[in-house]
């Protein structure tokens, strides 16, 4: 799974 925060 991948987590992206911007």
Swiss-Prot record:
Q: What is its EC number?
A: 2.4.1.5
Please summarize the temperature-related behavior of the activity in one or two sentences: Optimum temperature is 35 degrees Celsius.
How is this protein named in the record? Answer: Dextransucrase
Q: What does this protein do?
A: Involved in the production of dextran, an extracellular glucan polymer.
Q: Which reaction does it catalyse?
A: [(1->6)-alpha-D-glucosyl](n) + sucrose = [(1->6)-alpha-D-glucosyl](n+1) + D-fructose
UniProt KW keywords: Glycosyltransferase, Transferase
* Cysteine pairs bridged by disulfides in the record: none
One example GO MF annotation: dextransucrase activity
Which leading EC class covers this enzyme? transferase
Q: Which family does it belong to?
A: Belongs to the glycosyl hydrolase 70 family.
Q: How does activity depend on pH?
A: Optimum pH is 5.0.
- Other comment: Synthesizes water-soluble glucans (alpha 1,6-glucose).
């Amino acid at each position: 799974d991948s987590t992206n925060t911007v």
